[in-house]
Regions:
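Conserved ATP-binding/catalytic motifs of P-loop helicase motor domains
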Residues: 1-206, 210
Length: 215
């Protein structure tokens, strides 16, 4: 291990007093993710002035009232560029996402729902009654390149105003980096998942992305 660290085949970073060991390319990807999320979160945004009234309209249409934490999440989603919504099964994530989606669709023409796998995307579509795709399909794989490249990237950005990403704990670091690279500079990113699920890869998000809700 010492030899790998001294040759920089492995690298370390310390967060909150804990030292982590990285492969260089994954460390670079995580730092790029943190920087991109930080840039997105600094773009000015304000919640619609009618937001509370709009939430009440949704409640009346559905015949139930949102829990205080759900209302907080909805307000946060409509007033932030970057948000993390996390909770275990039965905590109301789907109901909250549906409310957020309804409000976003009233404001924007281009809202995308995606997930890391086809099964997760199908489930997301069923729960929201809204078209959802895998991240790969959203970015569109360029099969002519001979390697894993995407048609949508920094030079050919996605046209969406909002991207809601489900099953976030299962998203590969490099894939998430590619998604952020293809997002427009003022895009809203909502990351949804279960904090208690085993993550596929560790993503450290720095201070600029602090708008989040954890239940």
């Amino acid at each position: 291990l010492d030899e790998l660290l001294s040759s920089e085949e492995l690298r370390t970073r310390t967060f909150d007093g804990v030292e982590y060991i990285y492969l260089p390319d994954l460390l670079s990807a995580e730092e790029d993710i943190a920087a991109r999320l930080g840039q997105l979160s600094t773009f000015p945004t304000e919640a619609p002035p009618t937001l509370d009234a709009d939430i009440r309209v949704l409640e009346m249409a559905q015949g139930f009232a949102y829990a205080p934490l759900q209302r907080q999440a909805i307000r946060l989603a409509l007033s932030s560029r970057v948000m993390v919504l996390t909770g275990g099964p039965g905590t109301g994530k789907t109901t909250t996402v549906n409310a957020i989606l309804s409000l976003y669709e009233a404001l924007y023409d281009r809202v995308a729902l995606c997930a890391p796998t086809g099964r997760a995307a199908k489930r997301l579509s069923e729960l929201t009654n809204h078209a959802a795709s895998t991240i790969h399909r959203l970015l569109e794989v360029d099969y002519s390149s001979g390697s894993v490249r995407f048609i949508h990237n920094e030079k050919n950005l996605l046209k969406y105003d909002v991207i809601i990403l489900d099953e976030m704990s299962m998203v590969d670091v490099k894939l998430f980096q590619a998604l952020l690279a293809a997002a427009r500079y003022h895009c809203r990113i909502i990351m949804v998942g279960d904090a208690d699920q085993l993550p596929l890869s560790l993503i450290h998000i720095s201070e600029p992305t602090r708008p989040r809700l954890i239940s």
